[in-house]
């Protein structure tokens, strides 16, 4: 093992945060210094040249001053027996650079701590601050890291001797292995193995436990029910299926695959043909939808828990039918009170928690980063979601107890597209090859299905830790590229059948694969790719290593599939063959035995069916005491409640523009305020049809009324999607995610009541189907605190996600109030017809009360009538702004609309009944719309005719003021800016804790500027003019290489932009260059695309660049291309970072900077203003002086020059192409207008001759106007950024 010292690991502010944490923990630490240490396992020694090459590869990242280490060494590495994602990707880079002697690279962090003598307890506290024991260990010395590369002999399986010891043996194994088997399941297993006349092996028991866990089998939803002594006719699942039986319209697949599928629009799907040339393919683009939860792992270790939750849901989408394409995602979190240090709120008590789970604050600081990072690296925009905090001592169905979310809800979901012929799974032919696609097996994530099926605290701490997985999104991206290549082949798609690998690992995935196709399988254990030879058969077969799929391919198509995998560098292995007999055999060639030899019917067939015999409990809770509430204090509390408050800290960490198909993300208007009701995507680059997603959840209401909570969740999801052009309820489908503390008094009967309310009543009445969903039935946390038993039990929690087909995405209405549209009126639409129920409201919560009566949707017809009228108004473009009433009531609805429009309001509530608090803060179903003053009366009449009460409540004012009156009486008045400051303080506090606090402060101060102009556009050209048209008419399309490396994810939208400009866009993978299949000699242009090549390990774009510089063939190809006078090249984001590291072979680029970690030290996804500078770039001809917004999505965009003189030389060269500017057109120096902290706002630069340009922002994602988060009304189909690509076409001639 070679030990290679690296760069400092922590910036100054990260060291400061660590020192503050030590101080808060009363640790006598005076100084901490940290640096990376690289560990190289070698097959044979390196020569001097190879060593120098390896050291060069391992030199990356920003230039932070290092110094001689002093103090006690604490060396943190990944846990032995695991391989970190960093390791696999860094090793890939080394191999692609020709360093075949490097068996594996790994990285640790060496902390050097100067401190007084620490007690054993203090040492434990310090180690807890420096590493995550879920995924890391603390080693005493560098040499001890040899354990990371240790290779042990394979372990054997063990048997449980039930034949001799009977039931007791299985009961002991049940506890030891964490199987969570019920008594009747133990009886079932004993009966079957006695019949088979043999003892079960541990691997068989684990496989059975995972496949039959509540997590996988949904026993409660399939159970027989008796409630209050009365036998119920339907199971929960049958009531959900009732929605499909009543309204099967437009549903193509439900209840049987990894995701549901609904009929989509016909549009031009854009992808490369087998020859690599991108083309449009006009066909139905059906919509798949899925929403998952990953609650248990997120409670234990939030970052990997949320990351793998997102990754698993993405795999579900990709493994639908015979392979499909994930498109856009969503996320949601529900946790107990945050108790932000220095910002603890009056309603946030301190009830404690078990040691094995993290705090709600830690979940929300780390979990969203994990989910966002996976989506970012995979290349899926996350464009809607929700966040709720709730933890309260309440009187509910079970008397007075603490209800909350110590076991959090972590929601991951999304939609995708699938070809018509691939919606249904194919036939697995006898003899078909059964394949695992993706990364290797590792000894992680054991027993996750069973563990997540237990209440937090029931399993042992070791088993909790074992059930957490690790994420590698770049590997999943490679697998998805393989799936894409397969479905793009249409009729010749080699995939017959596909499933993702999730809970239970291969032990669940392979049996499910063959069983669903009425086949059996013969498998060879040693064919499973594994980087840990010492694993037992149980560990190999049952681990939940991520980023894996199982699929079947006919033998005659195996070579075709293998070639696709080789090009995409996606590992795969043939593990077995399909058999006619439905029997499962797993052979172990190492020990020459069969760890599994079972009929599939024992594993999956007739396990005992659950019965639930439960009683109903009624909640008794006093009414909210309004007498003690002062309105101004209520406003302050409501606006700082995380459920209501600004959620920027959850949004800007996630890429919202990748694919170039996002029409509506969370950020609204020129001031980019996060208040959007729904997410909208375009079907394709050549259409205006699309898809929409929205969410609805009102979980605290279930503490008063289960029925109301469910009805309100469905209604809210509809209200949130109503501002899009959908047309009919039948074009909306719902996902229902049910969370419940099953077995808790009153909760089982309440769950049945809630399912019945929407499955038998509401949804059938509306004509809406629920074709997909998920349940999590163990939402309770139990622990002992100094001899006292404590529990925190969640409310029954239904999270609804609505998916809709959009007819015209241009007609979507947002909450942005328009002060530039002439006289207008605000109409309040009340579907409750004047009721003001405050039970379960945010107002009650912030005063530590629950209230007595929950709001509900009393009349289904009101929602149906509202939607009908609203859809007609949207289609007619008669509504200027729209926002629903929900958490925080009418007051929140109004101020959020004012924030988005940067306008004042004059409101009169005289026509509304109730107290001031009731009128402003009730959360009955409703909405506010802004319409033309001339049309207001007629529009109001349309709603009234459908039974919806409509109030004219006022309009806009130019002053920075929110005035709310009751006739002549002033109810409330304050400046909009003061309210925005309150609303944004929660996100500021979270950002300051998590990110660079200086950046957080600058953003918070910007939000307090009443006169901030927002995004302002100034164009020096007509974007509708097609300067390339004369050249396109010549009929010859110049060839553009759309270059990607493994992990790149922005190539399709780049190809579409160049295709529109008249180029022949061709898909070129780096493996094509390295293998010699393709030469750059064929191309007039090259574009290096954005994404996460090699997951950005070894520096963003640096690994990609070094794989070119250290490979003779690649270096020659690129050198010749750049030296050719007629060639042009563009590098965007990751491609920009990569090309900046090729300066030595790009003429005229000597003055280019490197691009390193953003000043915020956070991935930044923003819609930022840039201005085109005077420069020679061929791409910016005729655009100089133009100021336009553009998508920004990167973690390493800060320009780094060698010194101040190098920056001055670059400025003097005249090659600066783009700068970030503020709304006044001045160079942006403050965050987030300058999102990465680059000197002088620099974000684009070109060579001295202008042929090669690199830039960090993404013009390819916004070349269509509809793909911009905001744009002026007068823009046509093409945004101004389309001019860049047309300029390139003009240059080629």
Swiss-Prot record:
The active site is at 1133 (nucleophile), 1258, 1260. Transmembrane segments: none annotated. This is Phosphoribosylformylglycinamidine synthase. It comes from Shewanella frigidimarina (strain NCIMB 400). It catalyses: N(2)-formyl-N(1)-(5-phospho-beta-D-ribosyl)glycinamide + L-glutamine + ATP + H2O = 2-formamido-N(1)-(5-O-phospho-beta-D-ribosyl)acetamidine + L-glutamate + ADP + phosphate + H(+). Phosphoribosylformylglycinamidine synthase involved in the purines biosynthetic pathway. Catalyzes the ATP-dependent conversion of formylglycinamide ribonucleotide (FGAR) and glutamine to yield formylglycinamidine ribonucleotide (FGAM) and glutamate. NCBIfam families: FGAM_synt, PRK05297.1. One of its GO terms (cellular component) is cytoplasm. In the N-terminal section; belongs to the FGAMS family. The lineage of its organism: Bacteria, Pseudomonadati, Pseudomonadota, Gammaproteobacteria, Alteromonadales.
């Amino acid at each position: 093992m070679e030990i290679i010292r690296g760069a400092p690991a922590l910036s100054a502010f990260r060291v400061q945060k660590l020192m503050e944490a030590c101080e808060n923990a009363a640790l006598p630490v005076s100084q901490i210094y940290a640096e990376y240490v690289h560990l190289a396992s070698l097959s044979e020694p390196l020569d001097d040249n190879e060593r120098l090459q390896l050291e060069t590869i391992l030199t990356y990242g920003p230039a932070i001053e290092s110094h001689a280490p002093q103090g006690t060494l604490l060396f943190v590495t990944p846990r032995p027996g695991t391989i970190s994602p960093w390791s696999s990707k860094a090793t890939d880079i080394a191999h692609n650079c020709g360093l075949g002697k490097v068996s594996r690279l790994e990285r640790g962090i060496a902390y050097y701590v100067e401190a007084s003598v620490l007690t054993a307890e203090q040492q434990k506290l310090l180690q807890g601050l420096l590493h995550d024991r879920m995924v890391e260990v603390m080693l005493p010395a560098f040499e001890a890291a040899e354990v990371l590369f240790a290779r042990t002999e394979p372990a054997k399986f063990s048997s449980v001797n039930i034949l001799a010891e009977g039931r007791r043996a299985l009961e002991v194994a049940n506890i030891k292995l964490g199987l969570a088997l019920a008594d009747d399941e133990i009886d079932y297993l004993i009966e079957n193995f006695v019949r088979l006349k043999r003892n079960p092996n541990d691997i068989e028991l684990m496989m059975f436990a995972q496949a039959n866990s509540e997590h996988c089998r949904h026993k409660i939803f399939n159970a027989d029910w008796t409630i209050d002594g009365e036998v119920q006719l339907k199971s929960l699942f049958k009531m959900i299926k009732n929605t499909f039986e009543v309204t099967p319209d437009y549903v193509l697949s439900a209840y049987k695959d990894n995701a549901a599928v609904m009929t989509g629009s016909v549009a031009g799907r854009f992808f490369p043909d087998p020859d690599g040339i991108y083309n449009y393919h006009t066909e139905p683009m059906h919509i798949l939808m899925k929403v998952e939860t990953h609650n248990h792992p997120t409670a234990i270790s939030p970052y990997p828990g949320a990351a793998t939750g997102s990754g698993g849901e993405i795999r579900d989408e990709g493994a639908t039918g015979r392979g499909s394409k994930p498109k856009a995602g969503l996320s949601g979190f529900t946790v107990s009170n945050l108790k932000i240090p220095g910002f603890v709120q009056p309603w946030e008590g301190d009830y404690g928690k078990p040691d094995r789970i993290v705090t709600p604050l830690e979940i929300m600081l780390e979990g969203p980063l994990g989910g966002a990072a996976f989506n970012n690296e995979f290349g899926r925009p996350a464009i809607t979601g929700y966040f709720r905090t709730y933890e309260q001592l309440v009187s509910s169905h079970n008397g007075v107890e603490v209800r909350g979310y110590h076991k959090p809800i972590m929601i991951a979901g999304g939609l995708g597209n699938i070809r018509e012929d691939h919606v249904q799974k194919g036939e697995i032919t006898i003899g078909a090859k059964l394949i695992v696609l993706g990364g290797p097996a590792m000894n992680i994530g054991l027993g996750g299905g069973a563990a997540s099926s237990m209440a937090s605290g029931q399993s042992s701490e070791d088993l909790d830790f074992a059930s957490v997985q690790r994420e590698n999104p770049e590997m999943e991206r490679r697998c998805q590229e393989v799936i894409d290549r397969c479905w793009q082949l249409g009729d010749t798609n080699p995939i017959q059948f596909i499933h993702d690998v999730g809970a239970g690992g291969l032990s669940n995935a392979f049996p499910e694969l063959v069983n669903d196709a009425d086949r059996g399988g013969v498998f060879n254990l040693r064919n499973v790719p594994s980087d840990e030879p010492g694993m037992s058969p149980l560990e190999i077969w049952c681990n939940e290593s991520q980023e894996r799929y199982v699929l079947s391919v006919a033998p005659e198509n195996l070579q075709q599939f293998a070639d696709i995998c080789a090009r995409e560098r996606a590992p795969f292995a043939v593990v077995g063959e399909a058999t006619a007999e439905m029997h499962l055999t797993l052979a172990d060639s190492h020990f020459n035995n069969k760890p599994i030899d079972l009929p599939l019917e024992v594993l999956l067939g007739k396990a005992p069916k659950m019965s639930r015999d439960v009683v109903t409990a009624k909640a008794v809770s006093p009414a909210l005491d309004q007498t003690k509430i002062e309105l101004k204090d209520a406003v302050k509390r409501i606006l700082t409640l995380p459920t209501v408050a600004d959620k920027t800290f959850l949004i800007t960490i996630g890429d919202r523009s990748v694919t170039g198909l996002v029409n509506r993300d969370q950020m609204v208007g020129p001031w980019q305020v996060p208040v959007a009701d729904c997410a909208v995507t375009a079907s394709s680059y050549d259409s205006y049809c699309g898809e929409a997603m929205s969410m609805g959840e009102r979980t605290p209401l279930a503490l008063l009324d289960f029925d109301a909570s469910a009805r309100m969740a469905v209604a809210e999801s509809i209200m949130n999607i109503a501002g899009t052009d959908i047309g009919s309820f039948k074009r909306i489908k719902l996902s229902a995610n049910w969370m419940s503390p099953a077995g808790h008094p009153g909760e089982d009967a309440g769950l049945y009541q809630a399912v019945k309310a929407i499955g038998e009543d509401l949804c059938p009445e509306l004509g809406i189907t629920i074709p997909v969903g998920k349940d999590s039935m163990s939402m309770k946390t139990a622990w002992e605190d100094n001899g006292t038993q404590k529990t925190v039990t969640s409310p029954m929690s239904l999270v609804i996600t609505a998916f809709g087909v959009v007819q015209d995405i241009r007609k979507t209405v947002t909450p942005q109030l328009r002060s530039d549209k002439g006289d207008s009126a605000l109409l309040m639409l009340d579907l409750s017809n004047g009721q003001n129920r405050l039970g379960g409201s945010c107002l009650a919560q912030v005063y530590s009360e629950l209230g007595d009566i929950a709001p509900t949707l009393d009349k289904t017809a009101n929602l149906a009538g509202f939607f009908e009228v609203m859809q007609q108004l949207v289609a007619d473009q008669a509504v200027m702004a729209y926002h629903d009433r929900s958490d925080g009531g009418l007051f929140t609805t109004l101020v959020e609309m004012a924030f988005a429009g940067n306008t004042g309001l004059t409101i009169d509530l005289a026509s509304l009944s109730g107290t001031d608090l009731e009128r402003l803060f009730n959360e009955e179903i409703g909405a506010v719309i802004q319409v033309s003053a001339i049309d207001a009366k007629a529009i109001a009449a349309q709603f009234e005719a459908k039974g919806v009460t409509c109030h004219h409540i006022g309009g806009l004012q130019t002053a920075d003021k929110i005035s709310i009156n009751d006739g002549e009486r002033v109810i409330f008045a304050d400046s909009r800016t003061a309210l925005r400051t309150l609303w944004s303080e929660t996100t500021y506090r979270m950002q300051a804790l998590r990110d660079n606090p200086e950046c957080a402060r600058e953003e918070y101060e910007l939000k307090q500027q009443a006169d901030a102009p927002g995004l302002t556009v100034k164009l020096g050209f007509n974007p509708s003019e097609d300067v390339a048209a004369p050249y396109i008419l010549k009929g010859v399309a110049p060839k553009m290489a759309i270059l990607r490396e493994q992990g790149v994810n922005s190539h399709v939208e780049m190809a579409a932009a160049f295709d529109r400009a008249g180029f022949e866009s061709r898909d070129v993978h780096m493996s094509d260059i390295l293998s010699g299949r393709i030469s750059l000699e064929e191309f007039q242009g090259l574009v290096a695309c954005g994404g996460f090549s090699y997951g950005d390990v070894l520096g963003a774009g640096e690994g990609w660049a070094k794989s070119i510089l250290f490979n003779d063939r690649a270096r020659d190809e690129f050198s010749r291309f750049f030296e050719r006078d007629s060639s042009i090249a563009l590098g965007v984001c990751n491609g920009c970072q990569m090309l900046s590291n090729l300066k030595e072979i790009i003429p005229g680029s000597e003055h280019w900077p490197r691009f390193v970690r953003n000043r915020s030290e956070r991935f930044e996804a923003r819609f930022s203003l840039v201005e085109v500078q005077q420069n020679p770039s061929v791409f910016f001809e005729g655009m100089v002086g133009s100021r336009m917004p553009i998508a920004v999505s990167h973690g390493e965009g800060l320009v780094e020059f060698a010194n101040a003189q190098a920056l001055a030389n670059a400025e003097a060269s005249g090659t600066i192409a783009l700068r970030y500017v503020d709304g006044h057109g001045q160079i942006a120096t403050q965050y987030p207008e300058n999102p990465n902290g680059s000197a002088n706002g620099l974000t684009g630069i070109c060579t001295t001759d202008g042929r090669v340009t690199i830039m960090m922002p993404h013009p390819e994602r916004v070349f269509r106007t509809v793909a911009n988060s905001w744009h002026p009304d007068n823009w046509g189909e093409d945004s101004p950024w389309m001019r860049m690509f047309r300029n390139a076409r003009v240059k080629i001639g």
